[in-house]
Amino acid sequence: MARGKFITFEGIDGAGKTTHLQWFCDRLQERLGPTGRHVVVTREPGGTQLGETLREILLNQPMDLETEALLMFAGRREHLALVIEPALARGDWVVSDRFTDATFAYQGGGRGLPRDKLEALERWVQGGFQPDLTVLFDVQPQVASARRGAVRMPDKFESESDAFFARTRAEYLRRAHEAPHRFAIVDSSESIPQIRRQLEGVLAAL
């Protein structure tokens, strides 16, 4: 069986990507069913036992900026080795709620960590590995902030300012502009039915 495909969902907190992730994966599995392939759904930080432990630390504990980035990439290395690469080698498709673009957007754009440091970590951990497709849920920070307002106990990222998320969004859009062949941008300011129509277009193009 041919190697599988790797799809990532990205966007600032409150963009709505997680709301649509399982719906997208269910539709993708329907398309892949006759081929015998499976859809593996995962997330970052997380995806492995170590990754989920790191997730709790990363989302809730204050820390030095470079420590934060190093922990993100440590979890990613484990995620690649134990989940993503084995699934792709089996011919399965993997859909991840966040991957490396999030680190460039949050730790780079949002927190200001120099891009060259992140690029060095990316080369070390991933080599040339990149997603086959990244679905970017794009929304104005003010809209995302209103959505996040419904979260009872926000983590340290969800608690960031609109200015932080404006920088994060700008970095996402910069990366999408630099790799248009890899990105599909979804206008997530629209209603759920409208967003799902956009996602149907993404699925049809696979």
UniProtKB/Swiss-Prot annotation:
The keyword Nucleotide-binding applies. One of its GO terms (biological process) is dTDP biosynthetic process. The keyword Kinase applies. Belongs to the thymidylate kinase family. InterPro entries: P-loop_NTPase, Thymidylate_kin-like_dom, Thymidylate_kinase. Phosphorylation of dTMP to form dTDP in both de novo and salvage pathways of dTTP synthesis. GO terms for molecular function: ATP binding; dTMP kinase activity. ATP binds at residues 11-18. It comes from the Bacteria. The gene is tmk. It is an enzyme of class 2 (transferase). It catalyses: dTMP + ATP = dTDP + ADP. Its EC number is 2.7.4.9. It comes from Burkholderia pseudomallei (strain K96243). HAMAP family: Thymidylate_kinase (MF_00165). Keywords: ATP-binding, Kinase, Nucleotide biosynthesis, Nucleotide-binding, Transferase. It holds the Pfam family Thymidylate_kin. CDD domains: TMPK. One of its GO terms (cellular component) is cytosol. The lineage of its organism: Bacteria, Pseudomonadati, Pseudomonadota, Betaproteobacteria, Burkholderiales. This is Thymidylate kinase.
